[in-house]
């Protein structure tokens, strides 16, 4: 019965079903639809922008094999728990980061210091469609190179969340973050010190910023939230 509906109606139904704004585990809900029948598969894969299709990658899957199966859709790279494998987990993240022109979302939390430093080393290139970056190291990593990290420019980034990531050159990078709405930096230390003057200067470019959190290791914090 449902296949009697016009394609435009089916597309509206699919759009409601695959809406990725609800939960990250719904990012690949569209995969269920494409396996129902050829008609549904064609409708879904012919409408990647309308349905906001994305491929979800995480450290626990063979990334290269997965990316070879599907069309070149935007990549959602995420891991929200400590289920990291010592070797192939980082290798899978690195394989996903090779697709820097396709990555739209990165969320890697509770990552060991050694693994995080390997990941940061693989991010010294441009990520032109990246809108969200969440990086949480279990302990402090080496300082990030401000000139090469993310290619030195983040024009599409909307959310930036860093924990235990020293980044003294962050203000230089933020100058390009004209779409940033949410900036949260936790466990800031002396090695990642950013002068108040430098931060204030870069804030003039962040005209869309709504949420700002700066939390220091000394338990002193400065937080501003606007709605």
Regions found by a protein language model. Give the residues of each.
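Hydrophobic regular-secondary-structure patch
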Residues: 2-118, 156, 169-170
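Concave beta-strand-loop units of leucine-rich repeat
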Residues: 55-57, 77-84, 107-113, 134-141, ...
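Acidic, glycine-rich loop-and-beta core segments that form the ion-binding/anion-interacting portion
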Residues: 219-221, 225-227
